[in-house]
């Protein structure tokens, strides 16, 4: 067994800061662990909602973020600001869209590995009628590798972006002006 040791987390963040900006935006701290410990940097813009089959722990280290939530049992969309120094535990299967509009913001997200055969999903909702436009599921092993192809497929296909309820075409990557307000 390899000898275990601690490391300075702030130094790790400083050494990986160049990866905490678009287009990558996040980095796994531990590659071979049962916990996915991810550092996420801002700014980011996203229009999808993640349906995560496990809990997610958020700790906002620097700057503020906004967690957009969708309660599928009531249809309600609402925002939870997570300020610098705040923590938040998101239950499994709560649709959420993490927004980090501030340049240089940094958050820590911790979640358990998925049980075998359990899928993650990303969903896009219509900005006009709030109906579900598209859902894509994935057997998630790597946030960095497995999610980008789902986004690319949606963004590059107008048919996938067309709302089946009102025929409005979803804007893809770019949310409407004012969608994120801290």
UniProtKB/Swiss-Prot annotation:
O2 binds at residue 46. It is an enzyme of class 1 (oxidoreductase). Substrate binds at residues 56, 100, 111. It catalyses: 3-hydroxyanthranilate + O2 = (2Z,4Z)-2-amino-3-carboxymuconate 6-semialdehyde. It holds the Pfam family 3-HAO. The keyword Lyase does not apply. Its EC number is 1.13.11.6. Fe cation 2 binds at residues 126, 129, 163, 166. Binds 2 Fe(2+) ions per subunit. It comes from the Bacteria. The keyword DNA repair does not apply. Belongs to the 3-HAO family. HAMAP family: 3_HAO (MF_00825). This is 3-hydroxyanthranilate 3,4-dioxygenase. It comes from Brucella anthropi (strain ATCC 49188 / DSM 6882 / CCUG 24695 / JCM 21032 / LMG 3331 / NBRC 15819 / NCTC 12168 / Alc 37).
